[in-house]
């Protein structure tokens, strides 16, 4: 017969387990566990087995363990987790890809009926169509102001009806009607609310960003920095190339307007004095490209023509 452990022994064992997880893992998903059953949680643990560990427990106990761990080891990188322990939450320690782990957890959501008193996590809309209920049960629909008609001896809903809005409590009439229609409008599972990695905490929406999104946002940021730097004449890595170009343009403009000159400026001055020289340069370049195209046309002309059917000994009127 197994010896039953005392509360103190259970706390010591829990503290030891949490400290070992803090030593081993650097990535943690904080997940809300409202309305998640023990069987569902067991399935999630089984699905994540290998590179992830799900740890549930009282928030006060987890906070105390993290605080003691930081004092003993001097490692305070997990301190941000303490502020995230609000409500019925659990910790998912992982060595795998955070996005993949979140997607794996989402697979274990299960449908649930709308029980009386529950706060609706989503809007509940009853679709139009035949309900399969006999006319004697129209009172449920009348109480909720749902337009119906009798069609072939059964009640039919005419238009879509928003029965419950997100954030509202489920009433007895709504619960009874949804049960009769066989609608399970809610789904429950571990819902990732925050992500921790190497001392940083961020929203789970960040996991949906692709590499292309990051590159685009980075490029936008660089462009904004360059624009601001140019506007206030403050040199930054993003703005320096543009500053050099603008500076060169200014020097060139000064050289054109004064007697000061240098080789590149001489060429510009020459074009400004005699624009025809610039016009002559363009046809020369075009002529070079035309000359290169001529041999290709000759080669094409030299290709033998395909033999016709008659030349090959065939005729349309051959038997």
Swiss-Prot record:
Coiled coil: none annotated. This is Large ribosomal subunit protein uL10. Transmembrane segments: none annotated. Keywords: Phosphoprotein, Ribonucleoprotein, Ribosomal protein. Ribosomal protein P0 is the functional equivalent of E.coli protein L10. GO terms for molecular function: large ribosomal subunit rRNA binding; protein-containing complex binding; structural constituent of ribosome. Residues 286-319 are annotated as: Disordered. It comes from Zea mays. GO terms for cellular component: cytosolic large ribosomal subunit. Residues 304-319 have a biased composition (Acidic residues). InterPro entries: Ribosomal_protein_uL10 (IPR050323), Ribosomal_uL10 (IPR001790), Ribosomal_uL10-like_insert (IPR040637), Ribosomal_uL10-like_insert_sf (IPR043164), Ribosomal_uL10-like_sf (IPR043141), uL10_eukaryotes (IPR030670). It comes from the Eukaryota. Gene3D superfamilies: 3.30.70.1730, 3.90.105.20. Phosphorylated. P0 forms a pentameric complex by interaction with dimers of P1 and P2. Belongs to the universal ribosomal protein uL10 family. GO terms for biological process: cytoplasmic translation; response to anoxia; ribosome biogenesis.
